[in-house]
């Protein structure tokens, strides 16, 4: 078969194109491999820092070369960003701290972080940067997000006034953290000398009960391992771990940090050495500035705990700190619909401040009833809580007491309530409830947590009343349950109850009610008993 000239030219062109395509592909592959290799040595900042008078660009080390110092101080680039979060605008030493670290370790990125732009402005040395967290309408969302401004493997969280005297101290912290591998220790800390002694604490956070409990932790020979710190310390954490927290740089920093890490099961290891110096002691030059700082810290702690849904802190010294409702403020939840308060939908129980108010109101009301000669008994769900817990049911939102109707005239607080309400000398509000023929005692005019008093009278040996609610437990019952009334422990006091509590409760709620807890309206929200 003869090949024409045109066929020969076409075949040659095809072969030539295939050769060109082959060499172009090889060249592209080699170029990509070269770029990948170069990329291992240099990590570039994703975005410029906002409000800094210039971009972060590449985090430049000593001698103008990009890179981070490794565990031995001679790696290709800095592994640690020094971050200072806590300082006061009216008196601080952020510039001195930055100078201290950059003088010893000029290759390390130094980042000061503030909620708003400080006034007076910070005076920072070259190599230190300021990041303002509050967003500005003329900037992209990434501009105020710290995770876009930290490009190193670790973050070293330092307090104001600290000084780096030992350049190798940071490498010691890195080695300690890396030595923990993938275990529960995810943070390593070193003390700051000549400040308040740092203490290792155990922290247990119970979001369901709105509570955080701090307790002292024992020290070990190679350092203490715990879940929180109290006092001044320098803390090293992996950048990935820090920015996987819901609020990585909350204020106060340690309070925010350790609540979140404790919930994740992470631990912090507090070393005895190295130690960091404090070049300003005390941190504030006047008692007035110290008072201002303490006041701002208290306000910031309250704001933080409320944002985390923590209303009670049990401190290591046994004292309580409360961040919930009080006699002067409204209760923590609104009007209850379908017998299901809003907090149950959040998989939480009654806030501890609300339980405290209910206990105080119950104790107060029972004392007045007993003093006045009014026979009463723990009724309904309140009796159920007393039998199960010797306290209020953890998710209940009021207290119910039954009383003898014929005894109402004995009590000055009750007998004149047919019209209006009464605010007594201790701020409790006594009223005839608008929902029915019963009485209600509120914690205060502002806080409507309450005790309900249900008047019953005997008829043919049965305790009854004239109006009823739709609750299944609101039924008549034999008077023999009240003859006699028996004392029992309830909410820190001794109160009276029916004499056969199991039979009384099973008459009202059904068989097995004591052993099988359930929310008031399972059709709306059912209790997961496996989590009890």
What are these regions (language model features)?
Residues 1-47:
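N-terminal signal-anchor transmembrane helix specifying type II single-pass membrane topology
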Residues 9, 16, 347-372, 416-508, ...:
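Conserved catalytic core of two-metal-ion nucleotidyltransferases
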Residues 12-19, 39-67, 220-225, 230-232, ...:
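C-terminal catalytic/acceptor-binding lobe
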Residues 75, 96-108:
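Short, acidic, metal-binding catalytic loop of nucleotide-sugar glycosyltransferases
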Residues 141-155:
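Active-site nucleotide-sugar/metal-binding loop of Leloir-type enzymes
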Residues 151-165, 402:
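Short beta-strand-to-loop acidic/aromatic patch adjacent to the donor-nucleotide binding site
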Residues 165-246, 425-456, 463-471:
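Conserved catalytic core of nucleotide-sugar-dependent glycosyltransferases
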Residues 366-397, 409:
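Active-site nucleotide-donor binding segment shared across nucleotidyl transfer reactions
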């Amino acid at each position: 078969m003869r090949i024409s000239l045109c066929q020969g030219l076409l075949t040659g062109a095809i072969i030539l194109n295939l050769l060109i395509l082959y060499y172009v592909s090889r060249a592209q592959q080699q170029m990509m491999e070269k770029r990948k290799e170069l990329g291992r040595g240099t990590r570039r900042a994703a975005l410029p820092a906002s409000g800094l008078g210039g971009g972060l660009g590449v985090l430049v080390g000593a001698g103008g070369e990009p890179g981070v110092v490794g565990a031995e101080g001679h790696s290709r680039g800095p592994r640690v960003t020094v971050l200072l979060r806590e300082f006061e605008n009216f008196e601080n030493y952020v510039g001195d701290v930055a100078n201290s670290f950059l003088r010893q370790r000029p290759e390390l990125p130094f980042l000061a972080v503030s909620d708003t732009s400080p006034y007076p402005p910070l005076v920072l040395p070259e190599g230190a940067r300021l990041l303002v967290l509050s967003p500005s309408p003329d900037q992209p969302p990434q501009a105020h997000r710290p995770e876009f401004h930290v490009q190193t493997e670790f973050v070293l969280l330092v307090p104001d006034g600290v000084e780096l005297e030992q350049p190798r101290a940071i490498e010691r912290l890195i080695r300690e953290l890396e030595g923990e591998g993938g275990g529960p220790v995810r943070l390593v800390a070193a003390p700051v000398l000549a400040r308040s002694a740092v203490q290792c604490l155990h922290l247990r956070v119970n979001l369901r009960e709105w509570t955080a409990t701090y307790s002292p932790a024992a020290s070990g020979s190679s350092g203490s391992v715990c879940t929180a710190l109290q006092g001044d310390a320098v803390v090293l954490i992996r950048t990935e771990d820090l920015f996987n927290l819901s609020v990585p740089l909350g204020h106060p920093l340690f309070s925010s940090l350790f609540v979140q890490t404790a919930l994740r099961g992470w631990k912090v290891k507090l070393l005895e050495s190295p130690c960091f110096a404090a070049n300003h002691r005390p941190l504030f030059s006047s008692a007035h500035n110290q008072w201002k700082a303490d006041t701002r810290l208290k306000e910031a702690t309250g704001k933080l705990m409320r944002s985390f849904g923590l209303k009670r802190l049990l401190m290591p010294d046994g004292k309580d700190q409360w961040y919930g409702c009080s006699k002067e403020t409204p209760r923590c939840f609104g009007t209850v619909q379908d017998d299901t308060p809003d907090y149950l939908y959040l998989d939480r129980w009654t806030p501890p401040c609300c339980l405290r108010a209910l206990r105080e109101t119950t104790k107060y009301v029972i004392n007045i009833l007993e003093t006045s000669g009014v026979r009463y008994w723990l009724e309904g769900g309140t009796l159920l809580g007393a039998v199960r817990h010797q306290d209020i049911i953890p998710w209940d939102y009021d207290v119910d007491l039954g009383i003898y109707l014929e005894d109402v005239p004995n009590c000055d607080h009750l007998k004149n309530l047919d019209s209006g309400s009464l605010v007594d000398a201790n701020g409790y509000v006594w009223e005839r409830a608008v929902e029915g023929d019963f009485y209600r005692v509120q914690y205060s005019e502002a806080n409507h947590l309450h005790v309900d008093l249900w008047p019953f009278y005997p008829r043919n040996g049965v305790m009854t009343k004239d109006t009823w609610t739709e609750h299944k437990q609101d039924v008549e019952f034999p008077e023999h349950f009240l003859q006699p009334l028996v004392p029992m422990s309830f909410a820190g006091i001794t109160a009276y109850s029916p004499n056969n509590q199991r039979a009384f409760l099973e008459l009202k709620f059904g068989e097995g009610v004591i052993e099988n807890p359930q929310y008031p309206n399972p059709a709306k929200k059912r209790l997961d008993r496996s989590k009890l």
